[in-house]
From Swiss-Prot:
Sequence similarity: Belongs to the GPI family.
Role noted for this protein: Catalyzes the reversible isomerization of glucose-6-phosphate to fructose-6-phosphate.
Protein name: Glucose-6-phosphate isomerase
Location of the protein in the cell: Cytoplasm
Organism: Mycoplasmopsis pulmonis (strain UAB CTIP)
Top enzyme class: isomerase
Pathway in which this enzyme or protein is active: Carbohydrate biosynthesis; gluconeogenesis; Carbohydrate degradation; glycolysis; D-glyceraldehyde 3-phosphate and glycerone phosphate from D-glucose: step 2/4
Keywords noted in UniProt: Cytoplasm, Gluconeogenesis, Glycolysis, Isomerase
Length: 427
């Protein structure tokens, strides 16, 4: 079942895709044979089929334990892929202001801001909270600092022996600082798989435990990913929309060094952030790659719209449109009509939003000459999001290999870390 429809008619001449059929087939075969650079991190591509049922049961049991214990807030501590996947999924499925009463999920360890961490500690001070700390090694500075502070707060309130019941570590299977700490202190543990990099980890316990605690059906999420995987593992470029997207981007980057991912739903903001990390870290190396940028329309049409329409031609857009939103609202007629909006009577807000989407695509492509790739999503369900995660992950792997870079490492981020530790005189 296709939950995502790709439209390239306003972006490229689709005949050009045929020139890459052979290369894409070769790359796909090598990915399947684990014979490409970075093969040791290809575990994500078969996650929906291979994830352990016992692990899913354990995740759901942990979420149910927290609910039974009356946990009001789960503090998820992690940075980058250790929080963006879960946060993006919660907002995508439930909206920015969830209407159902579920355990609240907050995220810490995403910065070194003293104000941010202090306010988060104050926020949970009088609430019953649990901690899910996520780090492969346990040495990443931002989550390590946050974990120390929240751990100390929980220990001071409950005593260390009782507090450990409400701390879960998602980390390496058998090594690392966090693994050793969790083992020594008796924290429950989930595993970050060795063959799955952080930015690809949303369908592992890294993303699944926070999502289960938030009341999201993680089995449906995985089911949607599994359905999509059957489509996106196809080596035939002309039948594989994820690979078509990758090739379209590859063609466009020859002229446009920036890609702006756009959505007309504000609750997709963290989906766009997740996508930026996925593509930015996977492609941006050896002086190559497309700069990933993002915008929420119609909001950002009132700030960036002028530049996109009339500014320097450095970008193409990939636009996400959702056919069926979480909620819709109909405009009712008012007798006085002081705001002169009665011409919209009986139109739904989603209809108006779609008109804005169509008008903007036409303006940007026909007048502004900005290529637009359209991704039309069926709805905001778990299954659709699972499919979208696999779509982007398959696409970025192919895109990286087309650029002749390893999509699964990120050597550039080590430079600032090394400098930081020198300044802090870490031995």
């Amino acid at each position: 079942m296709r939950r995502i429809r790709l439209n390239l008619q306003n972006a490229i001449n689709e005949e050009k895709l045929k020139e890459y059929v052979s290369e894409v087939e070769q790359i796909n075969t090598k990915m399947n044979n684990l014979s490409l650079e970075g093969f040791e991190y290809l575990g994500w591509k078969d996650l929906p089929e291979n994830i352990n049922k016992n692990e899913i049961d354990k995740i759901i049991e942990t979420a149910n334990f927290f609910k039974k214990e009356g946990i009001e807030v789960l503090v998820v501590i992690g940075i980058g892929g250790s929080f963006l996947g879960a946060k993006s999924a919660m907002d995508f499925i439930q909206g920015n202001y969830p209407t159902k009463k579920n355990m609240e999920i907050i995220f810490a360890g995403t910065s070194i801001s003293s104000t941010e961490l202090t306010q988060l500690l104050y926020y949970v001070e009088n609430k019953k909270f649990a901690i899910n700390v996520i780090s492969k090694s346990g040495t990443t500075l931002e989550p390590a600092i946050a974990f120390r502070e929240f751990r100390n707060l929980l220990n001071s309130r409950l005593g260390e022996n009782n507090a450990k019941r409400y701390i879960v570590a998602t980390t390496d299977a058998n090594k690392g600082l966090l693994f050793e700490m969790a083992k020594e202190k008796g924290y429950a543990r989930f595993v970050v798989p060795d063959n799955v990099g952080g930015r690809f980890s949303v369908l592992t316990p890294v993303g699944l435990l926070p999502l289960a605690c938030a009341g999201i059906d993680i089995e449906k999420l995985l089911e949607g990913a599994k359905e999509a995987n059957a489509l996106y593992k196809n080596s035939n470029l002309l039948e594989n929309d994820a690979y078509k997207y990758a090739v379209a981007r590859f063609l466009l980057q020859k002229k446009f060094p920036v890609e702006m991912l756009v959505s007309y739903e504000p609750n997709h903001m963290f989906l766009l952030e997740w996508w930026k990390q996925l593509f930015g870290e996977s492609e941006g190396k050896q002086g190559k790659g497309i700069l990933p940028h993002s915008a929420i329309f119609t909001r950002d049409l009132h700030s960036l719209g002028q530049f996109i329409q009339d500014g320097s031609k450095i970008m193409f857009e990939t636009v996400i449109w959702v056919d069926k939103p979480i909620f819709d609202l109909k405009i009712e007629k008012e007798i006085e009509d002081l705001d002169k909006l009665n011409y919209l009577t009986n139109k739904s807000l989603h209809q108006i939003n779609k008109a804005a989407f169509e008008a903007t695509v036409e303006a940007h492509t026909k007048v502004g000459l900005v290529p637009n790739i359209i991704l039309e999503l069926e709805d905001s369900s778990e299954k659709t999001l699972g499919a979208l995660f696999m779509f982007f992950e398959r696409a970025v792997a192919m895109s990286g290999y087309l650029l002749k870079v390893n999509p699964f490492n990120q050597p550039g981020v080590e430079v600032y870390k090394s400098n930081l530790f020198k300044i802090l005189e870490k031995k």
